[in-house]
């Protein structure tokens, strides 16, 4: 089964159209599902800026990416595992702005999942895909809970975004 991720890099904080069009990169990554995660991971990591900072105390210079890998990779894996594949012609979209990275997955919440209970309710729309991704060690079935515990401020933004999806 193939899946597509469309990566769009926007110059600015909002996408513009017409004479102010500000998309500086637009790339589609089309791969079988098990290769898609690796391909997207490599491509997106290459798009991130890397900052060099001098550590306080040791004086050593260390590099850190614009966005830590864990949250955005979890978002991509989750989107691949749980997107609505019945929505033909749709794709996962990763939009990179100057101040944020957004991951959109086609389809509405499945079955009993809502914006309010998503952090503790488990339901897999694509049981076979989720099982195979677990066997290949891409999924541990606790991604969103781990994300919320690790990134509480970003989780608040995520909840607000998820609530918009249900309207």
What are these regions (language model features)?
Residues 1-167:
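C-terminal regulatory or interaction extensions
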């Amino acid at each position: 089964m193939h899946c597509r991720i469309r990566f769009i890099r926007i110059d600015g904080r909002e996408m513009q159209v017409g004479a102010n069009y500000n998309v500086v990169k637009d790339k589609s990554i089309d791969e079988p599902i098990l290769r898609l995660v690796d391909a997207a991971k490599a491509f997106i990591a290459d798009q991130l800026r890397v900052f060099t900072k001098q550590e306080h105390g040791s004086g050593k210079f260390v590099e850190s990416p614009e966005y830590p890998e864990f949250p955005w990779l979890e978002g991509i894996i989750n989107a691949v595992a749980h997107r609505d594949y019945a929505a033909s012609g749709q794709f996962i979209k990763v939009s990179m702005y100057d101040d944020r990275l957004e991951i959109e997955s086609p389809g509405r919440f499945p079955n009993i999942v809502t914006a309010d209970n998503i952090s503790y309710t488990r339901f897999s729309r694509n049981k076979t895909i989720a099982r195979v991704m677990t066997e290949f060690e891409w999924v541990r079935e606790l991604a969103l809970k781990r994300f919320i515990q690790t990134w509480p401020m970003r989780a608040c933004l995520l909840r607000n975004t998820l609530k918009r999806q249900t309207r």
